[in-house]
Amino acid sequence: VTNGAAPVLETRDLTVRRGRAVVLDRVSLALPPGSITALVGPNGAGKSTLIAAVLGQIEFEGRILFHWRRDGRIGFVPQRFATDPTLPLTAGEFLALTRQRRPLCLGIAAAVRARVDGLLADADLGGFASRPLGMLSGGEMQRLLLANATDPLPELLLLDEPATGLDERAVRRFEEHLRAARAGSGITTLLISHDPAQVRRLADHVVELDRAVVRHAASVGLS
């Protein structure tokens, strides 16, 4: 699709069932290009299920349409990233995993290491390359995941309650890094959030799910 006005992501009558239960019921929404769209609603409304459908992780009915302008890359930051505290994988190795072809047991290539060091520095994690993932705080882990999800720049960024469990300072730092990652890039973003203040700070478009049905969509002013 070459129409510049076309949404980057569009769902049409998206329905997800779990047994006899309908989790998403004919949900139709569109994400304007370059926007941050907040997806809000009560627990159990199907917000995370919608992201799982977009990522192709679950079966669904209806249509999910992508109107790509570049390479169609999707970045994703989950609500939580479960790590085994005994796993020796470090922050630097985590970023290197998808940035080189050779196994990590053979070492990290010099060019990849330089790239990883740059990503860590941009995420305020300079000097953390050798720190095991299990030793990162919640805020540090979320900034690491954001750095991973936005390099290379995606066309669509999915954030599933990325600030859950973080204190106010960590939330604000995450938001600062999100703004920096999006600055001038035109990354279309879908943000799930239960924090009205965060939605007001970040979103310029809001979609409300109520009982798994889109009940309200509106534009909001950025603060």
Please place each PLM-identified region on the residue numbering.
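H-loop/switch region of ABC-family ATPase nucleotide-binding domains
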Residues: 193-194
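H-loop (His-switch) and adjacent beta-strand-loop-beta switch element
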Residues: 205-219
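Conserved ABC ATPase "signature" region
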Residues: 110-128
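The feature captures the beta-strand-to-loop junction immediately N-terminal to the Walker
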Residues: 40-42
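Conserved ABC ATPase signature
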Residues: 132-136
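Helix N-cap at the start of a conserved alpha-helix in ABC-type nucleotide-binding domains
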Residues: 168-170
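Catalytic Walker B motif of ABC-type/P-loop ATPase nucleotide-binding domains
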Residues: 157-160
